[in-house]
Every structure is written in C-alpha cells, then in structure tokens.
C-alpha cells in the first residue's frame, strides 16, 4: 500500500503498510472520515513522522489517544496549536520542566520546537472520533505504532523513551534496554501527576544521558 509519509519512515515501515491489518485499518479510517468528524484532519495523521525523520529521533514520548476536542490535536502527542488553551497534562509537563530545569513556563502548548530537535511524541492510536475518547482503539493503530517502537529500538541506539502511565509502561517490553534508556513515571494527568510525575526529573535525566553519549541535548 502506498502511504504518504516522510521517506526515511516510508523505507522502514513499508513492510507494515503492505500487511493485511494495515489495509483493513486504512479502509476503516477512510470510512470513518466519510461519516463522522474524525481527528486530526487526514493530512495530519502522520504529522510527527513527517516532522521528525527516523534518523533524527533522540527522545520518544509515548501517549495513548489523540485529544478528542476539535482544534487541539494535529498529529503530535500532547501538543496543541498556538493560541489553543494548554491542556492539563501538558501544563503539568511544563511545570515539571520548570521545576527540573528552571525553564520558564511557555505561553503556547505547541511542541513543534521539540520535534525539530529530535523529540518524537507519538500516540499509540493516531485517530479519534471528535468528543469520543478512545473511539479508534483496537482497530489496528496499536499494531502499527508498536512496530514503530520496535523499529526504533532495533535500528537506532542511545534513544530515550519516556513512558508515562500504566498504558505507556506496557510498551517497555518492545524496547532493548541494552541500547536505550527507559524513563517511567505516572501519567502527567491532573489526576495522577502528584503521585510521581512531579519530581521525576525525566527532562534533565534525558539530557544527561544524551550528553554522556556525545549527543546534543534537548532545549526543553
């Protein structure tokens, strides 16, 4: 199957695109776009892939579902466009960065500047019906994004994987810990951040690891 995606990802994921499950997934999602309000707009489904080539990835942040409210999600996990109110989880991420590294709290929740530096924030599920959280779970996206994680683990070295919350932590089994650093904590959601996300210092730990491997750190 021909999928429009950045060339370095195309090369490594074509095997997935050619599998029967992916064809079923694409047909299901196309049908959904035809009958319901689906997020993000179709051309933004692979936005994080198109913005961060395979060889540029330094830090992987794993999420679960896209934001279900129109105008928020545009293909980058946790991120929202300029001018959109910063969601609670992202606000807590910024608070932890402030506490950890002394960075001022930003006015925008747009994480494009992270992605340009090699941060790869990816949801496990890449589409959702508007206002219906989790509505596109178990249709094939998880199989695809698990393959992405495996490919990064196998073909890259010295990556940092940030796994927040029980769902993301389950993905640790896909990652080679001899080659990569895994950082785990509770989810930054307002419901859980006080129970171990605040104070996790993942952002300084990531930079310390990258520096120790001779890799330029992230300006969080």
UniProtKB/Swiss-Prot annotation:
Which GO molecular function annotations are given, in alphabetical order?
uracil DNA N-glycosylase activity
Instruction: Give the E.C. number(s).
Output: 3.2.2.27
Catalytic site positions:
65 (proton acceptor)
Q: Which SUPFAM superfamilies match?
A: Uracil-DNA glycosylase-like (SSF52141)
Q: Entry's InterPro entries?
A: UDG_fam1, Ura-DNA_Glyclase_AS, Uracil-DNA_glycosylase-like, Uracil-DNA_glycosylase-like_sf
Catalytic activity, reaction form = Hydrolyzes single-stranded DNA or mismatched double-stranded DNA and polynucleotides, releasing free uracil
Q: Which domain of life is it from?
A: Bacteria
The signal peptide annotation in the UniProt record is none
- What is the enzyme's class at the highest EC level? hydrolase
Per UniProt, the keywords (alphabetical) are: Cytoplasm, DNA damage, DNA repair, Hydrolase
Q: Which GO terms describe its biological process?
A: base-excision repair, AP site formation via deaminated base removal
- Gene Ontology CC terms: cytoplasm
Say if the entry is tagged with keyword DNA damage.
yes
SS bond partners: none
SMART domains given in the database record: UDG, UreE_C
Xref: Gene3D superfamilies: Uracil-DNA glycosylase-like domain (3.40.470.10)
Q: Which residues cross the membrane?
A: none
Classification via Pfam families: UDG
- Where does this protein reside within or beyond the cell? Cytoplasm
Q: Which family does it belong to?
A: Belongs to the uracil-DNA glycosylase (UDG) superfamily. UNG family.
Per the entry, what this protein does is:
Excises uracil residues from the DNA which can arise as a result of misincorporation of dUMP residues by DNA polymerase or due to deamination of cytosine.
Q: What is this protein called?
A: Uracil-DNA glycosylase 1
């Amino acid at each position: 199957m021909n999928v429009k995606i950045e060339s370095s990802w195309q090369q490594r994921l074509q095997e997935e695109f050619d599998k029967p499950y992916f064809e079923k997934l694409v047909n299901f999602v196309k049908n959904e776009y035809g009958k319901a309000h689906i997020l993000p707009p179709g051309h933004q489904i692979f936005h994080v892939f198109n913005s961060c080539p395979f060889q540029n990835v330094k830090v992987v942040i794993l999420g679960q579902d896209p934001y279900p409210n129109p105008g928020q999600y545009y293909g980058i996990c946790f991120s929202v466009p300029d001018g959109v109110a910063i969601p609670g989880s992202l606000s807590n991420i910024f608070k932890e960065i402030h506490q950890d590294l002394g960075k001022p709290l930003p006015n925008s929740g747009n994480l494009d500047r992270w992605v340009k530096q090699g941060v790869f924030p990816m949801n496990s599920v890449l589409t959702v019906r508007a206002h219906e959280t989790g509505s596109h779970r178990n249709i094939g996206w998880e199989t695809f994004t698990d393959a992405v994680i495996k490919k990064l683990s196998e073909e890259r070295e010295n990556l940092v994987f940030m796994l927040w919350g029980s769902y993301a932590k389950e993905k640790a089994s896909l990652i080679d810990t001899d080659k990569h650093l895994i950082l785990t904590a509770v989810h930054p959601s307002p419901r859980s951040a006080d129970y171990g996300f605040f104070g996790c210092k993942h952002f300084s730990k990531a930079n310390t690891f990258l520096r120790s491997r001779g890799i330029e750190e992230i300006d969080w």
